[in-house]
Structure formats: structure tokens, C-alpha cells
Amino acid sequence: MVARGETRSAALLAVALQVLIRDGYDRFSMDSVAALAHASKTTIYRRWSNKAELIKAALDAHDASFNDEVFDTGGLRTDLIATMGMLRRKAQALPPTLYPDLIRAMEHDETLSDAIRRHLADPGLSPFDAPLSRAVGRGEAGVDVDRQLIHDVAEAMLTHRLTLGGPLDDAFIGRLVDDVLLVLIRPGAR
């Protein structure tokens, strides 16, 4: 039985992600979430108006839970390595077919397309915001650092590596941080 209030919402979102992983987008339904969560459909619809919004909220909660793992290591390079390590764990926590399934569904479902775009564009979900803010405060990065570019490049490189089946090992993360991200953050520092 799912608890009440915020705990209930968090539990429903965890179940929704579980159903999405198990069934894929096309077979995902509010009924399946309600059944697995031992909750009423009314409880779910009171919080999320449709399945696209529920999926967005579940992905938001998933990302936010991993972002909580990023802590201050005391330096920009080590903060970036810690952030990339977290992104690796986040990527490995989901099946590699999840996002391609959602992207295919976005082609013919405008509601889902809008929800996923809002999820991906939410600056509050960027794991790079806190480390870059700390770096600016420590004088390791300029106030004009392009946070969105750093996020986009890091996730694109990670996604590319996952798609090709290449290793997401510490060596790759170190090269990505040293040869790409730090160069973008501090041009001319090499």
C-alpha cells in the first residue's frame, strides 16, 4: 500500500518508472500504475492529468534522486568527475531501450513530446548547476560559463558512448573532464 502525501507521490512515481521500464511507453497505463501501487486511479489523476505528465514526473524524480548524490569535493575537476560518475550510475540504472522507446513515441504523441522536452530542458535538474556555481565562487570558472553547453556536451558524450556500447569507465570520464569539459569551462587553460 502506498503511503499518503509526499511519500505517496514519491512512491507512485517510483512505481510509474517501474511500469514504464517493464511495459514501455505504448503499453504504459495509469491502470497498471494504480494496480501495482495498490492505489486508485483517482489518486493518480489528482496528481497527474495524463500518462505523459506522470512519466515526466517519474523521470524528474529519478534524475533529482541521483543529483542529490553530487557533493562538494573541494575542486572543479573532482566535482566534475563526481558528477560524471553520478551520471554513469544514473544511465546504468535505466535500461538502454527506455529513451529510444520514448523518442519513437514522441514522433506521434505531441503531449509526450512536450512533456519530455520540458523534462530535458529543466535547468533545475541539471547536475552541473551546483558544481559550476561552486567553481564560480572559488574563482575556478568565470561567471559567464555556459552551463547548458556543459550539460549538453557531457550528456551527449555519455549517450554516444552508451549507444555504441563503449566503456563508461573512469578513464573515459577522466578524458571527458580533462579534454572536453574543463576546456569548455576554462578556455586557454590547457
Curated annotation (Swiss-Prot):
Residues 29-48 bind DNA. This is DNA-binding transcriptional repressor TetR. Homodimer. Residues 6-66 form the HTH tetR-type domain. It comes from the Bacteria. It holds the Pfam family TetR_C_11. It comes from Mycobacteroides abscessus (strain ATCC 19977 / DSM 44196 / CCUG 20993 / CIP 104536 / JCM 13569 / NCTC 13031 / TMC 1543 / L948). GO terms for molecular function: DNA-binding transcription factor activity; transcription cis-regulatory region binding. The keyword Disulfide bond does not apply. PROSITE patterns: HTH_TETR_1, HTH_TETR_2. InterPro entries: DNA-bd_HTH_TetR-type_CS (IPR023772), Homeodomain-like_sf (IPR009057), HTH-type_TetR-like_transc_reg (IPR050109), HTH_TetR (IPR001647), Tet_transcr_reg_TetR-rel_C_sf (IPR036271), TetR_C (IPR011075). Induction: Expression strongly increases after 30 minutes and then decreases over 3 hours in the presence of tetracycline; not under control of whiB7. Probably part of the TetR-TetX operon. GO terms for biological process: response to antibiotic. Binds to its own palindromic promoter and represses transcription of its operon; addition of tetracycline or doxycycline (but not tigecycline) interferes with DNA binding. Addition of TetX to the DNA-TetR-antibiotic complex restores DNA binding.
